[in-house]
């Protein structure tokens, strides 16, 4: 999800290959389809009146989109230097405080030896087309945001499946310096060398996660809370959408979690919104979160096909 300057909420639907605009009309909300037939349009970002959509093979731009919701313009290709892949081939992306576009490129496998262009987060200068790698060893990130005070990049990452997956957590990570390596495929969770792919590497060579989120919770979208609607103690907290496990007998995730920080240290990690699962049955999967101008928190759910709004009763 991404927010337009006029309050339009843009939503990418990866499986449907569509991008939607949700418009608040006061007494009702209207949904318009502004693009279809796209390849995995998971990444959505808005800047200077334009909507940017990340497909598997390219990033496209829809200019002046909020004035043209009834007839979206023909998109312009702004970046296409992306590797071909069919595994983890969605491109989460967002504009950073420096004005550059950051794009996550997952590993082309559950776990494998990697070519240099995979398992990373890139910083792209759209004016020149040049990019630099700001984080390596990132298996499958589908959510990141910048700390509102330090401007450091924080991101979620999904750990490997199968094998000893119960020992491999999803992670919350912080990029303290460009080019840091976060372990994949050699080390998981900061302290578990991969039995097959560690290649004699020590976990001490890599950046350990700031927080282990739990195995197979499918930690996806995340945002720092910068609104003023929630009580003051929520400002600067992190909200993380956990879509939930898919290959475990004992299911995990299916919640939006709250992370309370003191500096860069986690003080609390606790459920914020639950109720998508009961007794091993689930009826929803939270995917992304978005802080609205009024301070409310939106939560997208790709199983129920819904967007929920969390606010505070006055």
Show where each model-derived region lies.
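Predominantly a core beta-strand signature of beta-propeller blades
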Residues: 28-32, 68, 73-79, 118, ...
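Asp-box/WD-like beta-propeller blade repeats and closely related beta-sheet repeat scaffolds
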Residues: 40, 45, 57-96, 104-107, ...
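Hydrophobic beta-strand segments that make up the repeating blades of beta-propeller
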Residues: 1, 8-11, 50-53, 101-103, ...
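Blade-loop segments of beta-propeller domains
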Residues: 14, 18-50
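Conserved beta-strand position repeated across blades of beta-propeller domains
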Residues: 1-2, 45, 94, 145, ...
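Beta-propeller domain segments
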Residues: 6, 90, 107-111, 119, ...
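Surface loop/turn motifs at the tips and blade-to-blade linkers of beta-strand repeat domains
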Residues: 32-37, 78-85, 133-138, 212-214, ...
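A detector of repeated loop/turn-to-beta-strand junctions in beta-rich toroidal repeat architectures
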Residues: 16, 56, 72, 115-118, ...
